Amino acid sequence: MRKKYFFFDIDGTLSTGLTTTMPESAVKCLDLLRQAGHFTAIATGRLQASAKTVADRYGFTNIVADGGWSVTIDGKILEMQSLPAAECIRFVDWLRGNGIPWAISPENEKLCVTSDRNYLSLA
């Protein structure tokens, strides 16, 4: 059989809603794909550090995260690019000026910086 490559989103695809809980049927399907020698990976807009938590829990070693800006293969980060700082600052200024809640992750950590005390309740 020819090796196939399967990429799965987390939120609402592998997991139930925005949780990190995966149905047993999805876990079984992933196990069968891996046993058959196929490549499995997570592809998500989530921060790599957040995706890695899910990946570790469910046996993924390959991750495309940060909306495609980072690539992890066999558990090693091969590529990670951040958005240009000046553009991010301009965008945050625009969000503030328009009263739109925002949060940023300046590092690859499950930590956000925000000026909005209610941000987590909005997410």
For the regions a protein language model found, what residue spans apply to each?
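A general structural motif
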Residues: 1-3, 37, 99
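HAD-like small-molecule phosphatases
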Residues: 69-123
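Catalytic-core regions built around general acid/base machinery
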Residues: 24-37, 90, 94
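Charged helix-capping and loop-helix junction motifs
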Residues: 22-25, 84-85
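Glycine-rich loop at the start of a catalytic domain that most often binds anionic cofactors/ligands
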Residues: 52-60, 116-120
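Asp-based phosphoryl-transfer active-site loop
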Residues: 2-19
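Substrate-recognition element of Asp-dependent hydrolases with the DxDx(T/V) motif
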Residues: 30-52, 67, 102-109
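Structural recognition of alpha->loop->beta junctions
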Residues: 56-74
